[in-house]
Amino acid sequence: MAKVTFVRTKPHMNVGTIGQIDHGKTTLTAAITKYCSFFGWADYTPYEMIDKAPEERARGITINITHVEYQTEKRHYAHIDCPGHADYIKNMITGAAQMDGAILVLAATDGPMPQTREHVLLARQVNVPAMIVFINKVDMVDPELVDLVEMEVRDLLSKYEFPGDEVPVVRGSALKAIEAPNDPNDPAYKPIKELLDAMDTYFPDPVREVDKPFLMPIEDVFSITGRGTVVTGRIERGVIKPGVEAEIIGMSYEIKKTVITSVEMFRKELDEAIAGDNVGCLLRGSSKDEVERGQVLAKPGSITPLKKFKANIYVLKKEEGGRHTPFTKGYKPQFYIRTADVTGEIVDLPAGVEMVMPGDNVEMTIELIYPVAIEKGMRFAVREGGRTVGAGVVSEIIE
């Protein structure tokens, strides 16, 4: 079949396979690319290619991730697959590869397992908007057992606040699709087609960063004689235009109001700047000593300064450059939250957890020495003595 030139005309979406090791995530990923290749929508990426995932670094942590891409009638998908359980945990916590939708792969032979639960919980905490279930290996068990597994997984999803009754559940065998002849009408591909149709219809279109309320972490502050105070940084989300009101948030509970009188990029004045742009904003009525690195410039009322929150933290192993010893309640590292570098204390650990070992992933309560702009699902790094010792994601706001 002739190669089709790739033109990005379809909406783009990031997805990924999650679930217990050996339940068939990588085989399913390969099967999707095989089926899509019949229509010129993908290059077939075999299991072996996906399995030897290249290393990537995110927030000082090394993660193995494979990216494949494919299209359907409706969308262009970038799909991630991680070989090891720890890689999934690290990816979800650092946000190295964001997921707008997740495909939970579950073997009919096992049903939900500990890693299945851990991945679903993390998907909830990092705000993965939607999930679809693929029950794999259905050729190896009785249909009654598959019904039971489906009931179990729907209960599990409901427990973690996903709409368990509405989530599409597709049943099939990824391996059978890999082994089937190259004919898209072969019955072995029916579940793969069903899964892609479910992704197209059930996964909502991602909210683009540009459509969210304006926020820019402040990287640098300087004053220009006769003009006022300029703050620089990369716009994280939203759009900004000159003449608009904004709030300066962080370092104290006081929220300072200001007006952005001009927006510049590469020494040129702009009518508007959007998410991803590196800009300088001239602030009216703010003196240089009122603004500092670590604060954020944001749309009024969109974010509040906080000191106390719960977060899921992955603690690096010694081999990853992390700590050699465990830590307990009362541990005080540095938290790198956007551009802020602030000391905080681990004030609480889950019931029954006395100490946190390198390599653990634990939800803990953190209290910072001063408030910064924080929201659920936000990523940060934990550092001590100039090295990264952990990566975290905010799971709950306390105060």
From Swiss-Prot:
Q: List locations, semicolon-separated.
A: Cytoplasm
Organism ancestry: Bacteria, Thermotogati, Thermotogota, Thermotogae, Thermotogales
Ranges for the region named G2 are 60-64
What role is this protein assigned? GTP hydrolase that promotes the GTP-dependent binding of aminoacyl-tRNA to the A-site of ribosomes during protein biosynthesis.
Q: tr-type G domain: which residues?
A: 10-207
Record-annotated membrane-spanning stretches:
none
Q: What is this protein called?
A: Elongation factor Tu
What is catalysed by this protein? GTP + H2O = GDP + phosphate + H(+)
CDD domains membership: EF_Tu, EFTU_II, EFTU_III
Origin organism is Fervidobacterium islandicum
Q: What is its EC number?
A: 3.6.5.3
Q: Which GO terms describe its cellular component?
A: cytosol
Q: Which Pfam families match?
A: GTP_EFTU, GTP_EFTU_D2, GTP_EFTU_D3
Principal localization?
A: cytoplasm
Q: Which domain of life is it from?
A: Bacteria
Where does this protein hold Mg(2+)? T26
